[in-house]
Amino acid sequence: QQDYGTGWFDF
């Protein structure tokens, strides 16, 4: 799931 708030990915 990509975290579009930070640009990183939530694992």
From Swiss-Prot:
Keyword Coiled coil (UniProt): no
Function: Hypotensive neuropeptide.
Entry annotated with the keyword Protein biosynthesis: no
Tissue occurrence: Expressed by the skin dorsal glands.
Modified residues (Pyrrolidone carboxylic acid): Q1
GO cellular component term, pick one: extracellular region
GO biological process, alphabetically ordered: defense response; regulation of blood pressure
Keywords: Amidation, Amphibian defense peptide, Hypotensive agent, Pyrrolidone carboxylic acid, Secreted, Sulfation
Residues annotated with Phenylalanine amide modification: F11
Post-translational modification summary for this protein: Isoform 3.2Y4 differs from isoform 3.2 in not being sulfated.
Recorded family membership: Belongs to the gastrin/cholecystokinin family.
Subcellular location: Secreted
The name this protein goes by in its record: Caerulein-3.2/3.2Y4
Residues recorded with modification Sulfotyrosine: Y4
